[in-house]
Design a protein with these regions (language model features):
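N-terminal membrane-anchoring alpha-helices
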Residues: 1-13, 17
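Short N-terminal helix/helix-N-cap motif within the alpha/beta-hydrolase-1
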Residues: 81-85, 111-112
Length: 136
């Protein structure tokens, strides 16, 4: 069956986890936010580094062991939900293992298009390279 044959709900459930799993998603995501707030203090990083003019064009950086690679974590909120603040617990786990970690925010749909998100992430990567190079 082609995706073009799906009814609107079927298409929406493929692209929106909140539709696919219902109320369980909110509880799960709220848990992420609470755990992220609790673990942010462990990071000792630099937060909300701007890489553009939009309020969501920011990243966080925890340097870890500068001899190890830097991992860039991009929020996977289906381009339209959440932000980096809900992902701090992932960042803390990686930084706790010695990696440098960058946690990136970007503007969300429908305010911007996917093409604009890609442009923002290109800008973010360029700014991250400059920032990390300055720290090493």
């Amino acid at each position: 069956m082609s995706w073009l044959d799906w009814i609107d709900h079927g298409i929406e459930s493929q692209f929106n986890p909140r539709v696919a799993v219902g109320d369980a998603a909110e509880s799960w995501l709220n848990g992420w936010v609470q755990e992220s707030l609790r673990r942010k203090a462990e990071l000792g990083g630099v937060f909300d580094i701007a890489y553009g003019t939009h309020e969501l064009m920011q990243f966080d950086y925890a340097s870890g062991d500068l001899a190890l690679p830097v991992i860039i974590y991009i929020n996977g909120g289906y381009w339209r939900a959440l932000d980096k603040s809900a992902m701090m617990h992932h960042m803390a786990d990686l930084a706790g293992s010695g990696f440098g970690v960058v946690n990136v925010n970007y503007p969300l749909c429908p305010e911007v298009t996917l093409t604009e998100i890609i442009a923002c992430l290109n800008d973010a990567i360029a700014a991250i390279v400059v920032h990390v190079d300055a720290k090493t």
